[in-house]
Protein backbone atom coordinates (compact mmCIF):
# COMPACT_ATOMS: atom_id res chain seq x y z
CA UNK A 1 0.00 0.00 0.00
CA UNK A 2 1.10 3.52 -0.65
CA UNK A 3 0.93 6.50 1.64
CA UNK A 4 1.07 10.19 1.03
CA UNK A 5 4.13 10.68 3.24
CA UNK A 6 6.75 8.77 5.20
CA UNK A 7 4.97 9.28 8.49
CA UNK A 8 1.67 7.61 7.70
CA UNK A 9 -0.31 7.35 10.93
CA UNK A 10 -1.84 3.92 11.38
CA UNK A 11 -2.91 1.64 14.21
CA UNK A 12 -2.55 -2.10 14.69
CA UNK A 13 -4.92 -3.70 17.17
CA UNK A 14 -4.81 -7.26 18.47
CA UNK A 15 -7.77 -8.96 20.13
CA UNK A 16 -6.24 -11.85 22.07
CA UNK A 17 -9.14 -14.07 23.02
CA UNK A 18 -9.40 -17.46 24.63
CA UNK A 19 -10.46 -19.09 21.36
CA UNK A 20 -9.26 -16.80 18.57
CA UNK A 21 -6.76 -14.03 17.99
CA UNK A 22 -7.60 -11.25 15.56
CA UNK A 23 -5.35 -8.58 14.06
CA UNK A 24 -6.59 -5.34 12.52
CA UNK A 25 -4.75 -2.55 10.75
CA UNK A 26 -6.54 0.80 10.59
CA UNK A 27 -5.69 3.94 8.67
CA UNK A 28 -5.89 7.36 10.27
CA UNK A 29 -9.51 7.75 9.13
CA UNK A 30 -10.52 4.39 10.59
CA UNK A 31 -10.58 2.43 7.33
CA UNK A 32 -9.74 -1.27 7.69
CA UNK A 33 -6.59 -2.02 5.70
CA UNK A 34 -5.89 -5.53 6.99
CA UNK A 35 -7.77 -8.10 9.02
CA UNK A 36 -6.70 -11.59 10.00
CA UNK A 37 -8.15 -14.10 12.46
CA UNK A 38 -6.46 -17.27 13.70
CA UNK A 39 -7.04 -19.76 16.53
CA UNK A 40 -5.40 -18.93 19.86
CA UNK A 41 -3.00 -21.82 20.59
CA UNK A 42 -3.62 -21.78 24.34
CA UNK A 43 -3.28 -25.57 24.62
CA UNK A 44 0.31 -25.13 23.42
CA UNK A 45 1.15 -22.64 26.16
CA UNK A 46 2.43 -19.12 26.62
CA UNK A 47 5.32 -19.17 24.15
CA UNK A 48 3.03 -20.37 21.36
CA UNK A 49 0.57 -17.55 22.05
CA UNK A 50 3.41 -15.03 22.20
CA UNK A 51 4.66 -16.22 18.81
CA UNK A 52 1.18 -16.15 17.30
CA UNK A 53 0.59 -12.55 18.39
CA UNK A 54 4.02 -11.36 17.25
CA UNK A 55 3.58 -13.06 13.89
CA UNK A 56 0.20 -11.46 13.29
CA UNK A 57 1.56 -8.02 14.19
CA UNK A 58 4.35 -8.50 11.66
CA UNK A 59 1.81 -9.54 9.01
CA UNK A 60 -0.20 -6.38 9.61
CA UNK A 61 2.86 -4.13 9.69
CA UNK A 62 4.04 -5.61 6.38
CA UNK A 63 1.04 -3.93 4.72
CA UNK A 64 2.53 -0.53 5.54
CA UNK A 65 5.33 1.30 3.74
CA UNK A 66 8.72 0.44 5.33
CA UNK A 67 9.14 3.88 6.88
CA UNK A 68 5.57 4.19 8.16
CA UNK A 69 4.87 4.66 11.84
CA UNK A 70 2.07 2.94 13.73
CA UNK A 71 0.75 2.44 17.22
CA UNK A 72 0.18 -1.04 18.60
CA UNK A 73 -2.43 -2.03 21.16
CA UNK A 74 -3.50 -5.41 22.50
CA UNK A 75 -6.66 -6.34 24.36
CA UNK A 76 -6.28 -9.38 26.61
CA UNK A 77 -8.75 -11.47 28.64
CA UNK A 78 -7.16 -10.37 31.90
CA UNK A 79 -5.17 -7.45 33.29
CA UNK A 80 -1.60 -6.40 34.02
CA UNK A 81 -0.51 -6.08 37.61
CA UNK A 82 0.13 -2.33 38.11
CA UNK A 83 3.21 -3.09 40.23
CA UNK A 84 5.13 -5.77 38.32
CA UNK A 85 3.42 -5.75 34.91
CA UNK A 86 2.63 -9.47 34.94
CA UNK A 87 -0.63 -10.84 33.54
CA UNK A 88 -3.27 -11.85 36.07
CA UNK A 89 -7.00 -12.66 36.17
CA UNK A 90 -6.86 -14.23 32.69
CA UNK A 91 -9.22 -16.98 31.58
CA UNK A 92 -6.40 -18.17 29.33
CA UNK A 93 -4.54 -19.26 32.45
CA UNK A 94 -1.26 -19.93 30.62
CA UNK A 95 -0.86 -16.14 30.36
CA UNK A 96 -0.93 -15.63 34.12
CA UNK A 97 2.36 -14.62 35.69
CA UNK A 98 4.03 -13.70 32.39
CA UNK A 99 5.39 -10.32 31.28
CA UNK A 100 3.37 -10.21 28.06
CA UNK A 101 3.93 -6.51 27.39
CA UNK A 102 7.71 -6.53 27.78
CA UNK A 103 8.06 -9.89 26.02
CA UNK A 104 6.21 -8.57 22.96
CA UNK A 105 8.19 -5.33 22.98
CA UNK A 106 11.39 -7.38 23.02
CA UNK A 107 10.24 -9.57 20.10
CA UNK A 108 8.85 -6.73 18.00
CA UNK A 109 11.16 -3.85 18.88
CA UNK A 110 8.10 -1.62 19.16
CA UNK A 111 6.13 -0.06 22.04
CA UNK A 112 3.05 -2.07 23.00
CA UNK A 113 0.00 -0.98 24.96
CA UNK A 114 -1.84 -3.78 26.75
CA UNK A 115 -5.29 -3.39 28.28
CA UNK A 116 -8.19 -5.56 29.36
CA UNK A 117 -10.30 -6.49 26.34
CA UNK A 118 -13.62 -5.63 27.99
CA UNK A 119 -12.28 -2.21 28.98
CA UNK A 120 -11.21 -1.60 25.36
CA UNK A 121 -14.60 -2.67 24.06
CA UNK A 122 -16.47 -0.51 26.56
CA UNK A 123 -14.34 2.56 25.83
CA UNK A 124 -14.94 2.14 22.08
CA UNK A 125 -18.71 1.90 22.59
CA UNK A 126 -18.61 4.87 24.96
CA UNK A 127 -16.77 7.15 22.55
CA UNK A 128 -17.97 6.01 19.15
CA UNK A 129 -20.69 3.39 19.53
CA UNK A 130 -23.92 2.58 21.34
CA UNK A 131 -22.81 4.32 24.54
CA UNK A 132 -21.83 7.63 22.95
CA UNK A 133 -23.30 10.57 24.83
CA UNK A 134 -23.97 8.63 28.05
CA UNK A 135 -22.22 9.49 31.30
CA UNK A 136 -22.12 5.90 32.55
CA UNK A 137 -21.58 2.85 30.33
CA UNK A 138 -21.24 -0.80 31.37
CA UNK A 139 -19.96 -3.07 28.61
CA UNK A 140 -20.32 -6.85 28.64
CA UNK A 141 -18.27 -9.41 26.73
CA UNK A 142 -19.60 -12.94 26.49
CA UNK A 143 -17.24 -15.28 24.68
CA UNK A 144 -14.85 -17.95 25.90
CA UNK A 145 -15.01 -16.05 29.18
CA UNK A 146 -17.33 -13.41 30.57
CA UNK A 147 -15.90 -9.92 31.03
CA UNK A 148 -17.05 -6.40 31.69
CA UNK A 149 -15.88 -2.81 31.67
CA UNK A 150 -17.06 0.49 33.14
CA UNK A 151 -16.78 3.97 31.61
CA UNK A 152 -17.75 7.14 33.43
CA UNK A 153 -17.62 10.54 31.75
CA UNK A 154 -15.77 9.07 28.78
CA UNK A 155 -13.03 7.39 30.82
CA UNK A 156 -12.45 3.75 31.74
CA UNK A 157 -12.71 3.09 35.48
CA UNK A 158 -10.37 0.18 36.18
CA UNK A 159 -10.23 0.39 39.96
CA UNK A 160 -7.03 -0.07 42.01
CA UNK A 161 -6.65 -3.69 40.89
CA UNK A 162 -7.78 -3.09 37.28
CA UNK A 163 -10.78 -5.42 37.61
CA UNK A 164 -13.57 -2.97 38.47
CA UNK A 165 -15.92 -4.16 35.72
CA UNK A 166 -15.22 -7.88 35.95
CA UNK A 167 -18.69 -9.11 36.84
CA UNK A 168 -17.93 -12.63 35.59
CA UNK A 169 -16.38 -13.62 38.91
CA UNK A 170 -19.25 -12.81 41.19
CA UNK A 171 -20.40 -16.06 42.76
CA UNK A 172 -24.09 -16.73 42.23
CA UNK A 173 -23.99 -20.38 43.35
CA UNK A 174 -21.59 -21.20 46.22
CA UNK A 175 -22.11 -24.91 45.53
CA UNK A 176 -21.64 -24.54 41.78
CA UNK A 177 -18.83 -25.53 39.45
CA UNK A 178 -15.29 -24.61 40.42
CA UNK A 179 -13.86 -21.65 38.52
CA UNK A 180 -10.21 -21.15 37.54
CA UNK A 181 -10.21 -18.16 39.93
CA UNK A 182 -10.62 -20.70 42.80
CA UNK A 183 -14.18 -19.56 43.55
CA UNK A 184 -17.32 -21.60 42.91
CA UNK A 185 -20.41 -20.78 40.91
CA UNK A 186 -19.06 -17.66 39.22
CA UNK A 187 -21.21 -16.05 36.55
CA UNK A 188 -18.53 -17.07 34.05
CA UNK A 189 -18.96 -20.77 34.87
CA UNK A 190 -22.64 -20.49 33.94
CA UNK A 191 -23.02 -18.28 30.87
CA UNK A 192 -19.64 -18.03 29.10
CA UNK A 193 -18.90 -20.21 26.10
CA UNK A 194 -16.56 -22.42 28.11
CA UNK A 195 -19.08 -22.57 30.97
CA UNK A 196 -21.91 -23.69 28.71
CA UNK A 197 -19.63 -26.28 27.11
CA UNK A 198 -18.60 -27.65 30.52
CA UNK A 199 -22.23 -27.80 31.70
CA UNK A 200 -23.25 -29.69 28.56
CA UNK A 201 -20.46 -32.21 29.13
CA UNK A 202 -21.48 -32.71 32.77
CA UNK A 203 -25.11 -33.30 31.83
CA UNK A 204 -24.73 -35.29 28.61
CA UNK A 205 -21.18 -36.65 28.61
CA UNK A 206 -20.45 -35.16 25.18
CA UNK A 207 -18.31 -32.27 23.98
CA UNK A 208 -19.84 -29.48 21.94
Q: What is each model feature region?
A:
Residues 2-10, 24-27, 34-36, 44-48, ...:
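Glycine/GP-enriched mid-protein hinge/lid loop-to-helix segment characteristic of carbohydrate kinases
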Amino acid sequence: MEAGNNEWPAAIGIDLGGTKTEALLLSADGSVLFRRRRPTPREEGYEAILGRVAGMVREAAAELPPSASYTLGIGIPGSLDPVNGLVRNANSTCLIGHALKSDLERLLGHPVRVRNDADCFTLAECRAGAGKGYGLVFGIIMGTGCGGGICMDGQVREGPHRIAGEWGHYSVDPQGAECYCANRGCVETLISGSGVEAAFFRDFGERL
